Design a protein with these regions (language model features):
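C-terminal closing repeat unit and adjoining cap/tail of repeat-based domains
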Residues: 171, 176-220, 226
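WD40 beta-propeller blade core
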Residues: 1-3, 47, 94-95, 132, ...
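Loop/turn-rich, solvent-exposed surfaces of beta-rich toroidal or solenoidal domains
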Residues: 125-133, 140, 145-186
Length: 226
């Protein structure tokens, strides 16, 4: 940890080293209410640290114990909500109790895309176009859809891989590598519509501000949609 005042190191933590080169970065989530920070290393170690006391609250290893060590571990960004953290990894998708690190539920579904988390649901998507709606409390699958498998759906080679999902009102907005918006009914997973939003593709994931969608394309232009 680095002081924002003078740039000096406040805390250094040595984690288990990984000898594999990977494009995936360590994911970090801040809990400012309880002064905690959560992060996952590329070796599959999940840490909870209090950044005021500089103490480790708990440590959990979510990489399979029977792994040979040669497999690539990755995780999605961490979502922190109501004393739980949610993330997907190369192993499974998890809901974790932030107080003690215990697993609330685990689902054998892997993705590196950030999940959507509400009080009732957790939505997951893979790059290949597979969408899942999960009950937040139990981890049970409510519905699942494969967007690119049905004949009436857009083809993956046309619209590209999914790179992000966002809940917009009563729809899931998915963005793709080839600059498409996909609009999905959150209740059923049905694809409602899709449109080409950027010719160059997306540089950033979209955000919602004042009922408008903002994103940055690969030419570093800010795009705004109603």
């Amino acid at each position: 940890m680095i002081s924002e005042i003078n740039g000096n190191q406040i805390l250094g933590l040595e984690t288990f080293p990984s000898f594999l080169k990977t494009k995936y970065k360590t994911n970090i989530s801040l809990d400012s209410k309880n002064n905690n920070v959560f992060f996952i290393t590329s070796s599959g170690e999940l840490y909870s640290i209090n950044y005021y006391s500089n103490n480790i609250n708990w440590l959990s290893n979510i990489f399979p114990r029977n792994s040979s060590g040669s497999e690539l571990f990755y995780s999605s960004p961490i979502v922190n909500r109501n004393d739980k953290i949610y993330f997907s990894s190369s192993v499974s998708t998890y809901s974790i109790n932030t107080n003690n690190g215990s697993i609330n539920w685990e689902l054998p579904f892997s993705t590196n895309l950030r999940p959507i988390v509400t009080d009732q649901f957790v939505f997951l998507a893979s790059e290949e176009g597979f969408i899942i709606n999960i009950d937040n409390a139990t981890g049970k699958v409510i519905w699942s859809k494969s967007l690119y498998k049905e004949k009436s759906k857009p083809k993956r080679n046309k619209v590209g891989d999914i790179i992000s999902i966002l809940l917009v009102s009563d729809q899931i907005l998915a963005t793709t590598t080839k600059g498409y918006f996909l609009f999905i009914d959150y209740k059923t997973g049905k694809l409602l519509n899709y449109t080409k939003a950027s010719k160059s593709g997306f540089y950033s994931s979209p955000v919602i501000v004042d009922q408008k969608i903002y994103t940055i394309d690969n030419k570093l232009r800010i795009l705004i949609f109603n």
